[in-house]
Regions:
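Membrane-embedded alpha-helical segments of integral membrane proteins
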Residues: 1-34
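Short, well-structured beta-strand/strand-turn elements
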Residues: 15, 271-277
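Basic, ligand-binding patches in group-transfer machinery
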Residues: 30-103
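Short, solvent-exposed loop/turn elements at domain surfaces
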Residues: 98-101, 108-110, 199-200
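The AdoMet/dcAdoMet-binding core of the Class I SAM-like
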Residues: 117-261, 268, 274
Length: 278
């Protein structure tokens, strides 16, 4: 109930306060049922009512409380913070350094993100003469798309990202559209907000080049996007001589995970070439 329904809809802060309110109400109800056996029933009732009022107020102002707490967590100014049904999105800024955090984990800094996104896109795309159809899985920030659109041969880019709040934010916020060069609003772009695994299962399109830009596999829902089942689906959607590039953690800080992903790709028939940017 907590991870499937409440947390995605209400957020972690509001859900936690809701359970606290339920506990306070249960305590108050129990005290009232046994009021004849409890000598301090009036004080207990006042305490339960007071706790319930405070928790109810906390539920009402949960978003503001979360933002205030994040102001203490992040060293830079928080310019955007919102909980979507899928994740907590926070954007910070210090001078010209804009950073994206998802569930508290740094995803990029505008000062050096180009090193990652250029390395993610250009080696693979330059190996394909006249690639026309491109698939981007994840990458709702539009930064990988920005690099893809530098190729005149590209006619269409399909972006599949689970969270509509991410693609909305990075296609509308002026600071972020400057960063991704308004890539998500290009007429060549088709944005689909869906689970990438399920979308690949149902879709029959073929692509010359695929960019798989998911966060590191830190939980089950992300881990399934690094499995043999997922990579088999991906391979079926590549055209003849098609190429896919996969974000594969770090060979320095997550060496075992990195090489596990390489071996998983090889096991489904990919000719995998591992590389990383310095």
């Amino acid at each position: 109930l907590f991870p499937i329904l409440l947390a995605p809809k209400l957020g972690v802060m509001r859900t936690s306060l809701l359970f606290g309110l339920l506990n306070a109400l249960v305590a108050g109800g129990t005290a009232w049922l046994f009021r004849r056996q409890l000598p301090q029933i009036r004080m207990m009732t006042i305490q339960c009512l007071g706790a319930s009022v405070l928790l109810l107020a906390g539920i009402f102002y949960a978003e503001r409380l979360t933002t205030l707490a994040e102001g203490e967590i992040y060293s830079d100014e928080v310019i955007y913070a919102k909980s979507s049904p899928y994740q907590r999105i926070v954007i910070t800024r210090w001078k010209d350094d804009v950073r994206l955090f998802l569930n508290g984990h740094l995803q990029f800094s505008s000062r050096d993100e180009y090193r990652y996104h250029e390395a993610l896109v250009h080696p693979g795309l330059q190996s394909i003469p006249q690639a026309r159809r491109v698939l981007v899985l994840g990458g709702g920030d539009g930064l990988a798309v920005r690099e893809v659109l530098k190729y005149d041969s590209v006619e269409s880019v399909t972006v599949v990202d689970l969270d509509p709040e991410m693609t909305r934010l990075f296609s509308q916020h002026p600071i972020l559209t400057r960063l991704n060069q308004n890539s998500l609003n290009s007429p060549k772009i088709r944005i689909i907000n869906a689970d990438a695994f399920l979308w690949l299962e149902k879709n029959n399109d073929f692509f010359d080049f695929a960019v798989v830009d998911f966060p590191d596999p830190s939980n089950f829902s992300l881990g399934k996007l690094y499995t043999t089942a997922f990579y088999r689906l991906l391979r079926r959607h590549l055209s003849e001589n098609g190429v896919a590039v996969i974000q594969a953690t770090s060979p320095l800080f997550a060496r075992q995970s990195y090489w596990c992903i390489v071996k998983t790709l090889q096991s489904v028939g990919f000719h995998a070439t591992p590389y990383h940017a310095y």
